[in-house]
């Protein structure tokens, strides 16, 4: 068996968690780890002589481990007085070493896994244990304002790619020992750290158990982003509607947890999943709860109005132009007819040309660098729209319709819902081109039936309206004043449903003076 085959066999043994013990022979341990890490130039081996005939080596990943801490907090104490304590309990080592976490391990597979996770491991000759030192470091992105969820009023902190930084940001906001965080490792190759967070006593135990089971059942070699987990654990993978919400905002996650939901943190991504969710939740922005309720209600009504525009306006235009011209006022009908006179295509083809062009421009604006992406989107839309009208490919009313539809889709606060609405426009346009208004009605019936059937971890997707819940209606189409929302949503929370909100009338204060 050549060296490569031996390395592959050793890797397979370690991935299958086969218990290969650490040898007391230092040379054998060094050979095994060297064979295991062959071709990994970022993994560093440093050999040392501790004196009194005792030799050893330390292994770590350069760039993840703080190399300056190795000398100060690991090797120097060993050279001074720890060489005789390596077989002692972790507590003795913990009390002597100035390192946050120290562990002794006898299994080579666990030692290898800890190296990959970013720990340093020290071996000494004649000792069948490896000393795992948690001295992780390296460069990570600092806390910044969320790019995808910026607000005028509210927290400026956003999640980063560091799992423990993200969980700490939530701990800062929810200061209770009832906030539980359960850790998982997913991915045979990546061994990605995943944390399920919930507030014990508020979250429904059945929902939490369901989330745990679904996470444990995930079998995959790599998890690089929370989207992997989302597709594995959602109720209906084939539905166009999202059944989990993702967010970059710690205040949003804290608010979801306090309502009895759970959050799933994934290492190496700033996006945290929350659930269960409803359709109405996807139409809410964090700023709705920071502004005065009258302003929040006005903006929320605008969102629902533009949701209707984003979904139905192109289909209604196609249906009216194709079958129901008599529904238009006479002057408008003549104006549209004169604009469409030189157009060689039916309304559905005209709509598809403009909608697909608009989607292409939107995608180009996202993928291009920020400095030119927005400019390309705006100028591209203006130039292409004007040129298409002048060339007689599309009519001016169609350009207006597509522009209004695009602007309306930007008012939807959650991107995963907005992209679903954009996708559903196309089947509605096809139905409108075949059956007219009746096709739109048919599509709407199918859509509503699907939404009524859809669930998120057993919670109805339209909960609050279907089934109707009086307490939850206060935060669907309107946001009632905080002092009237005295109970948590019963759909998600169990146990303590009281929020403790109470408001004293200022007039009573004046009377008491």
From Swiss-Prot:
It is a multi-pass membrane protein. The chain crosses the membrane at residues 262-282, 304-324, 341-361, 382-402, 429-449. Pfam families: GerA. It comes from the Bacteria. Residues 489-513 are annotated as: Disordered. Its main location: membrane. GO terms for biological process: spore germination. Keywords: Cell membrane, Membrane, Transmembrane, Transmembrane helix. The keyword Transcription does not apply. It is found in: Cell membrane. GO terms for cellular component: plasma membrane. InterPro entries: Spore_Ger (IPR004995), UPF0353/GerABKA_families (IPR050768). The keyword Protein biosynthesis does not apply. Belongs to the GerABKA family. This is Uncharacterized membrane protein YfkQ. It comes from Bacillus subtilis (strain 168).
């Amino acid at each position: 068996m050549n060296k490569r085959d031996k390395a592959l066999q050793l890797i397979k043994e370690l991935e299958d968690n086969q218990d290969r013990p650490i040898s007391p022979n230092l040379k054998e341990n060094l050979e095994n780890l060297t064979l295991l890490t062959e071709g990994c130039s970022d993994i560093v081996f440093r050999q040392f002589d501790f004196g009194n005939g005792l030799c050893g080596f330390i292994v770590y990943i350069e760039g993840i481990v703080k190399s300056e801490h190795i000398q100060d907090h690991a090797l120097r104490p060993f050279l001074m007085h720890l060489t005789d304590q390596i077989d002692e309990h972790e507590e003795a080592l913990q009390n002597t070493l100035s390192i946050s976490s120290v562990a002794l391990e006898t299994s080579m597979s666990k030692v290898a896994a800890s190296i990959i996770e970013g720990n340093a491991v020290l071996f000494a000759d004649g000792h069948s244990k490896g000393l795992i030192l948690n001295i992780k470091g390296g460069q990570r992105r600092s806390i910044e304002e969320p790019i995808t969820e910026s607000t005028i009023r509210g927290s400026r902190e956003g999640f980063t790619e560091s799992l423990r930084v993200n969980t700490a940001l939530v701990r800062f906001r929810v200061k209770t020992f009832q906030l539980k965080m359960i850790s998982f490792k997913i991915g045979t190759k990546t061994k990605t750290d995943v944390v399920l967070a919930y507030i014990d006593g508020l979250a429904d135990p059945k929902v939490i158990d369901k989330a745990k089971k679904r996470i444990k059942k995930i079998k995959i070699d790599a998890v690089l982003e929370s989207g992997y987990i989302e597709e594995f654990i959602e109720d209906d993978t084939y539905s166009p509607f999202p059944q989990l919400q993702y967010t970059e905002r710690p205040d949003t996650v804290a608010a979801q947890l306090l309502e009895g939901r759970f959050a799933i943190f994934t290492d190496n991504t700033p996006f945290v999943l929350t659930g269960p969710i409803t359709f109405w939740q996807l139409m809410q922005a964090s700023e709705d709860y920071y502004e005065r309720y009258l302003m929040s209600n006005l903006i929320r009504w605008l969102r629902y109005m533009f949701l209707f525009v984003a979904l139905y306006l192109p289909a209604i235009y196609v249906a009216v132009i194709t079958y129901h011209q008599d529904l238009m006022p006479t002057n408008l009908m003549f104006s549209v007819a004169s604009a469409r006179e030189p157009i060689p295509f039916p309304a559905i083809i005209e709509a598809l040309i403009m909608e697909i062009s608009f989607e292409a421009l939107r995608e180009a604006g996202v993928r291009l660098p920020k400095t030119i992406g927005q400019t390309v989107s705006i100028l591209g839309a203006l130039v292409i729209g004007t040129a298409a009208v002048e060339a007689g490919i599309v009519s001016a009313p169609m350009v207006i319709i597509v522009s209004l539809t695009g602007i309306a889709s930007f008012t939807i606060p959650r991107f995963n819902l907005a992209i679903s609405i954009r996708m559903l426009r196309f089947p509605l346009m096809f139905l409108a081109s075949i059956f007219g208004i009746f096709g739109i009605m048919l599509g709407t019936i199918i859509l509503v039936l699907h939404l009524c059937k859809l669930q998120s971890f057993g919670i109805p997707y339209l909960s609050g309206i279907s089934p109707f819940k009086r307490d939850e209606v206060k935060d669907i189409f309107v946001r009632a004043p905080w002092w009237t929302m005295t109970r948590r949503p019963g759909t998600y929370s169990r146990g303590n449903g009281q929020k403790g909100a109470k408001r004293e009338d200022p007039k009573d204060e004046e009377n008491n003076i």
